[in-house]
From Swiss-Prot:
It comes from Streptomyces griseus subsp. griseus (strain JCM 4626 / CBS 651.72 / NBRC 13350 / KCC S-0626 / ISP 5235). This is Probable DNA ligase. The gene is lig. DNA ligase that seals nicks in double-stranded DNA during DNA replication, DNA recombination and DNA repair. Its cofactor is Mg(2+). The keyword Transmembrane does not apply. The lineage of its organism: Bacteria, Bacillati, Actinomycetota, Actinomycetes, Kitasatosporales. InterPro entries: ATP-dep_DNA_ligase, DNA_ligae_ATP-dep_bac/arc, DNA_ligase_ATP-dep, DNA_ligase_ATP-dep_C, DNA_ligase_ATP-dep_cent, DNA_ligase_ATP-dep_CS, DNA_ligase_ATP-dep_N, DNA_ligase_N_sf. GO terms for molecular function: ATP binding; DNA binding; DNA ligase (ATP) activity; metal ion binding.
Length: 511
C-alpha cells in the first residue's frame, strides 16, 4: 500500500466529524491493505509508531526539503526505514539519522511529508479511532461489528484481530477467547457530575472507591503470574510485592482487575507520581520496592478456576472476587439496592465524603447487573470525583494539524509567580469546541509576539479556566509539577493576568 493512500485517508478522517463517513473511509483503506500492511497501517492511523519512541522531534526534522512529485513510498518501506533509523547509534549517529530523515522526506510528496511530520512528532489529530476502526474493519471483512469488537477486547489489539480477519475471514474471530496469560483491554468508566446522578442512571449498584493508582490486570496460571498495565504492557518483573501477594492466594488460575497504589505510613495514598515511578523504571527493582512499596487492590474478577466471568453480572463477578480475596486486597464499597430510598442516597454521598477524606480520588458507581465490557467506556460504570479548576494564563500556542490546520490549538499554560512572571505548568488542546477554537485563534493572533512556524508566543494577558484531575511531579516544568488531564472550560476575559492563580496556590493543592 502506498503511503499516499494512508495519508489521504487520514486527512479526510480528520476533516469530518461524521462517524459514518469515518467508518466508510477506513473500511475502504482496510480493503486495499495487504496482510503485510496491516501491522503498520493501524498504528499509523492511531498516530503511533510500531517502534515506539525513536528519538525524532521537531528539531530533528530540520529544514523542509523539496517534496517528490509522484508518490512512491509504501507503508512497509517507511516502516523499515524508521526501524533502521531507530537502530542508528554510535559516533556520528546524529548526522546519519538526519541524513536518513532527509532522504525519506525527499522521497515523499507534500501530502506525505505533512503526514510523516505529524506522525513523527505525535501530532496526528483525527479523534479517537479505536471504536470506529473496529467497525470499519467489520465492514471491510463482512463480519458482524459486535463480533469484531469482542475479538479486539479479548485480543487486546485491533492490529492482531485485523491481521487474522483480513487474511482468514470472519470465521477466524471465534478463535479469540479470554485466555489466562493474554491481557484484555480494561473496562473504562464514564463521568457523572454527582453520586445522585449516577444512582439515577444505573439503578441498583455498588459505590466503590476510586483509587489514584496504576490500573493493573493480573493473570495467574499455576506458578506463572503476570501483571499488565491498562495499555497491556507487562510490568511483572518490576513488582515483586505484587507477585508475592498473588502467589499467596488459594486459587491457582484466574484473571483479576484492580489498581496498584503506594500508601504512606498513615495509610493515605502517596502522590501518584511515586506510584507511577514503580511501573516506569526497571532499575534497582529491590531498592524501589523498599523505598516505594505498592499494594494491589482489586475490584473485579474476569476468570476464576476455569470459569469465564466476562458476561456474568457484576454482582456475580464481585461475589467470586470476595471468595478469592481477603478484605484488604479489595476496594472498599457500599451497595445501594434501592437508589430511590433517601437513606441509601445519603449513605452513598457519605461514602464519597469518607473516600475523599482518606485521600482518594472519588468513587466509581457500578451497575450490579452489567457484564464486563472490556475496552469500552460503557454507561454501566460512572466515575464521580471533584472537579479541580485553575485560572491560568496563556503563554504560547502551537499551530494545529489535521482538521485543526490553520488554527492555533495547543495552549501553553502558566501560573503567576510573585515577581509577576509566569511558570509554565503544561499544555492542552482538550475541551476546545470548534467555536472556541475559532475565537481563540483570532484572539491569540492579536497577542502574538513571536512565531517560529510551530509555536506562537503571545503576550501573557489572556486568562483561561482549566479543569484538571490532579497534579503530578515533573522536572520538565519550572514549578516542578504539571496538570493531569487538563482541559479548557472557558476563557475569563473578565480577569486580568494579575488575577490568575499563583504558583503558590497550585503547589498548595498537592496532596
Amino acid at each position: 500500500m502506498l503511503l499516499a493512500e494512508l495519508a489521504q485517508v487520514s486527512l479526510e478522517v480528520a476533516a469530518t466529524s461524521a462517524r459514518s463517513r469515518k467508518t466508510a473511509l477506513l473500511a475502504g483503506l482496510f480493503r486495499n491493505a495487504g496482510p503485510e500492511d496491516v501491522p503498520v497501517v493501524i498504528p499509523y492511523l492511531a498516530g503511533r509508531l510500531p517502534q515506539g519512541r525513536i528519538g525524532v522531534g521537531w528539531r530533528s526534522l530540520g529544514e523542509p526539503v523539496e517534496p517528490a512529485c509522484d508518490p512512491t513510498l509504501t507503508v512497509t518501506g517507511v516502516d523499515a526505514e524508521l526501524t533502521a533509523l531507530a537502530a542508528t547509534s554510535g559516533p556520528g549517529s546524529q548526522a546519519r539519522r538526519r541524513e536518513r530523515l532527509r532522504t525519506l522526506f525527499a522521497a515523499a510528496t507534500a501530502d506525505e511529508q505533512r503526514f510523516l511530520r505529524a506522525l513523527l512528532t505525535g501530532e496526528v489529530r483525527q479523534g479517537a479511532l479505536d471504536a470506529v476502526a473496529a467497525d470499519a474493519l467489520a465492514h471491510a471483512a463482512g463480519a458482524p461489528p459486535a463480533d469484531v469488537r469482542r475479538a479486539v477486547m479479548l485480543a487486546g489489539s485491533l492490529q492482531d484481530v485485523a491481521t487474522v480477519l483480513l487474511a482468514d475471514g470472519p470465521g477466524a474471530l471465534a478463535d479469540f477467547r479470554l485466555t489466562v496469560g493474554r491481557p484484555v483491554q480494561p473496562m473504562l468508566a464514564r463521568s457523572a457530575a454527582s453520586v445522585g446522578e449516577a444512582l439515577d442512571k444505573l439503578g441498583p449498584c455498588a459505590v466503590e472507591e476510586k483509587l489514584d493508582g496504576i490500573r493493573v490486570q493480573v493473570h495467574r496460571d499455576g506458578e506463572r503470574i503476570r501483571a499488565y498495565t491498562r495499555t497491556l504492557d507487562d510490568i511483572t518483573d518490576r513488582l515483586p510485592e505484587l507477585v508475592s501477594a498473588v502467589a499467596a492466594l488459594h486459587a491457582r488460575r484466574f484473571v483479576l482487575d484492580g489498581e496498584l497504589i503506594a500508601l504512606g505510613e498513615d495509610g493515605r495514598p502517596r502522590p501518584f507520581q511515586e506510584t507511577a515511578s514503580r511501573v516506569g523504571s526497571r532499575r534497582d527493582v529491590a531498592g524501589a520496592a523498599a523505598h516505594v512499596p505498592v499494594v494491589p487492590v482489586f475490584f473485579d474478577a474476569l476468570r476464576v478456576d476455569g470459569e469465564d466471568l466476562l458476561d456474568r453480572p457484576f454482582a456475580d463477578r464481585h461475589a467470586a472476587l470476595a471468595r478469592l480475596l481477603p478484605d484488604d486486597l479489595r476496594v472498599r464499597r457500599t451497595v445501594v439496592a434501592d437508589p430511590d430510598a433517601p437513606e441509601a442516597r445519603a449513605a452513598a454521598d457519605a461514602f464519597l465524603a469518607a473516600t475523599l477524606e482518606r485521600g482518594h480520588e472519588g468513587v466509581v458507581v457500578k451497575d450490579l447487573a452489567a457484564a464486563y465490557s472490556a475496552g469500552r467506556r460503557g454507561a454501566s460504570w460512572l466515575k464521580v470525583k471533584p472537579v479541580h479548576t485553575l485560572d491560568l494564563v496563556v503563554l504560547a500556542v502551537e499551530r494545529g494539524s489535521g482538521r485543526r490546520t490553520g488554527k492555533l490549538s495547543n495552549l501553553h499554560l502558566g501560573a503567576r509567580r510573585p515577581d509577576g512572571t509566569f511558570a509554565m505548568l503544561g499544555k492542552t488542546f482538550k475541551g476546545l469546541t470548534d467555536a472556541l477554537l475559532d475565537w481563540q485563534t483570532a484572539r491569540l493572533r492579536e497577542l502574538a509576539t513571536d512565531d517560529d512556524g510551530h509555536v506562537v508566543t503571545v503576550r501573557p494577558e489572556l486568562v483561561v479556566e482549566i479543569a484538571y484531575d490532579g497534579l503530578q511531579r515533573s522536572t520538565r516544568y519550572p514549578a516542578g509539577v504539571t496538570l493531569r488531564f487538563a482541559r479548557v472550560l472557558r476563557y475569563r476575559e473578565d480577569k486580568t493576568a494579575r488575577e490568575a492563580d499563583t504558583v503558590e496556590t497550585v503547589l498548595s493543592r498537592q496532596r
